[in-house]
Amino acid sequence: DVKGPYTGSGNDNEWGQMLSEILTGIMQKNYSIIQKKYDRAVQTEHPGNTTVHSWADTEFLWMGLRSSFPNATFKLEHVIGREDPMLSPRAAVRWSLSGKHEGWGMFDEPSGAEVYIMGFTHAEFGPYGLRKEFTLFDPVSIWKQIYMQK
């Protein structure tokens, strides 16, 4: 990536730290963190117009991504949390995965292609944990990186 003019890394709000801890756990393949930190009625939104409402389905979505890139390097790029009157605590994290497509998962048969993924996760927290998660990354750009190296 080309280094841009903004070099901030966010703030130190507890909700941003909570979301970064959750994402780091997921990327370390500690999927049990979802049942520990998410509301059991979580609403999860992922690319491809995918909406699910449970721990198991949320785990499935994250496993599909991580399984395709099992040894890719995960990096927290920007972490921010916020609390305001009359609103739920919330957080946003920009993250990246960089490495080889060397596992079976959401991107089919391993190709060995070098892939860079930039992702964003926004979350809202409630009394029982993370209750809404919105994660965005571009599957088309990932497929393109895979196919251009075949």
What are these regions (language model features)?
Residues 1-150:
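C-terminal and inter-domain tail/linker signature
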